[in-house]
């Protein structure tokens, strides 16, 4: 009954201690999961921020992008390391001290080769395998996976196929096979510090990253010089490492001389405390060192756990409780140490990255965007003011143009009327008189050719006069206006001129000159001279002129005396001759014959003189006089119509100038509106960007707060 009670007591104590140690180890798993989540969010945070910077032209800064990419790469690297971070326990000691047996006891199952003598031939790293992997053993840096049963051949020094001492053999087991592996704990078994002196590099590579170092001693002997030297080397490389000393095989040592058990135990404690405090300096007080020294039997603990010992004795229970105390203490120490050593640097790195990101990127970018928003708002306000000024200027220029156009129109009417009247009054008579070409009145066809040549001559002179006196000045004034309002000088403006097609031939198409001889003292001539108008025979049907052009037709033949007899016949038959006869009869009755004869002689002399003077030149002068008077008369009647044509041409060209100016002004206005719209769009996009950056800053602060909570939860209280 006593043995049963002791068994139940041992079971309850074991359960309590196991629960306590498991809770501490689970903190590591929880902390690792939480820190992985934080780093995952931090990676997404940096990735999203990098995307914003790459898509935003205003914030593109090569150096900043490189810094951000470096942060992102660093976070990814730490996240990969963090996923591999596990709590690591390294077991050291001479061969045959029971290192493998201690590990098997922790695993609750004999996994590693364990026997008397030199057993473990290489470094064995026992760890949980991946979720999709089967249990296997694997030599480091090799891809071949071997069954777990191959462990006895590869890791046992008694096997001919044993690996070299410098080789690392990874033993991957299922998490549910052993509770300690479920908490990301890695157990490192070593070949023995006394196997060879050339294992320093391997120890540095495989064991120096351990969170807890356990020195397994043989309780049947004392600490050897090799073991002392090894831990001195460890203490020199690490700052106050967590060292535990297991005096294994205490069941054997205590059974040799039971009466000396306590003295031997005290001797072991004294020497171990001296090693930990005085020689290694890893603990400050003897009490701290005392709590890290244990007297156990790993083989007994394994047998109890696998059911080989069902009714342990009292001493066996004491040794097993000591092993449980060791397991609990090292688990707590392992969790605390691993939290600090594994997660402390990662925590500081994340905090440093967030602080640097905030100080070098986010805050400067928020300030830069705010400054750009203010600058663009100021530019937009200036553009709006410029648009208002431009609208006012356009209205002023429009009114000024209208005033200039009215002045030009009035000038065109005034100058055009003056030029045309001056042409009619002075230029036509002088130009007709100065025209020189052979004149043959006896040939009607030649007179028609003469008239056409005279018309062409006048057309050229009159058109040139209008061009010089009206068209060119108008062109210059229009060019000055275009320069004043800032219009580019177009080719059509330089080539523009008034169109003035005179075509005198059309005006004079029904002109029929009277080149017959008329005595100046004849009654008909005197009568018409009194009336002030010499008759010019013309066709009763005048061809109507077209606007800006006239119909062409052959000139009418002139009225001339065919020969002397015809001229005499016309004199006899004419009204003037009859009047002369009547007047002579009255003179004979009123005066005496001598007076009548004298007067008749004088009149006859004048007649003979005029007839003799009626030469070709005189007929040409008469032709020109009749032509000039009729052309003046007809042009004078068309002055207003011609001036109206000038005004219409000017208005059409001024309308073109106005349209060009309106188009250019509207183009400038549209450009200002487009620039304003672009600035508004930029401001809106930058405001969205500013809001995004502020959200990123808040997310960064949230991540920093999570890191602070993590530190408070898992690191500070430890």
From Swiss-Prot:
Membrane-topology annotation of the record: Multi-pass membrane protein
Null mutant phenotype: Defective mitochondrial fusion in spermatids results in onion-staged nebenkerns with irregular borders that contain many small mitochondria. At the leaf-blade stage nebenkerns contain many small mitochondria instead of the two mitochondria derivatives seen in wild-type spermatids.
Residue ranges, annotated region (G1 motif): 93-100
Binding of GTP, residues: 96-101, 248-251, 297
Gene Ontology molecular function: GTP binding; GTPase activity
One record GO biological process: positive regulation of mitochondrial fusion
Cytoplasmic side: 1-575, 615-718
Transmembrane parts of this sequence: 576-588, 592-614
Chain segments carrying region G3 motif: 189-192
Example of a GO cellular component annotation carried by this entry: mitochondrial envelope
Start and end residues of each stretch annotated as G5 motif: 283-286
Coiled coil: 366-402, 664-687
Location, primary (coarse class): mitochondrion
Reported tissue expression: Specifically expressed in male germ cells, in spermatocytes and early spermatids. Not expressed in other tissues.
InterPro entries: Dynamin_N, Fzo/mitofusin_HR2, G_DYNAMIN_dom, Mitofusin_fam, P-loop_NTPase
Keyword set includes Signal: no
Annotated Dynamin-type G domain residues: 83-364
Sorted UniProt keywords: Coiled coil, Developmental protein, Differentiation, GTP-binding, Hydrolase, Membrane, Mitochondrion, Mitochondrion outer membrane, Nucleotide-binding, Spermatogenesis, Transmembrane, Transmembrane helix
Residue segments, region G4 motif: 248-251
Mitochondrial intermembrane compartment segments: 589-591
Enzyme Commission designation: 3.6.5.-
Main enzyme class: hydrolase
PANTHER family: TRANSMEMBRANE GTPASE FZO1 (PTHR10465), TRANSMEMBRANE GTPASE MARF-RELATED (PTHR10465:SF3)
Family: Belongs to the TRAFAC class dynamin-like GTPase superfamily. Dynamin/Fzo/YdjA family. Mitofusin subfamily.
Biological role: Essential transmembrane GTPase, which mediates mitochondrial fusion during spermatogenesis. In early spermatocytes, fusion of mitochondria give rise to two organelles named Nebenkern and constitutes an important step in mitochondria morphology, which is balanced between fusion and fission. Essential for fertility.
Protein name (Swiss-Prot/TrEMBL): Transmembrane GTPase fzo
Gene: fzo
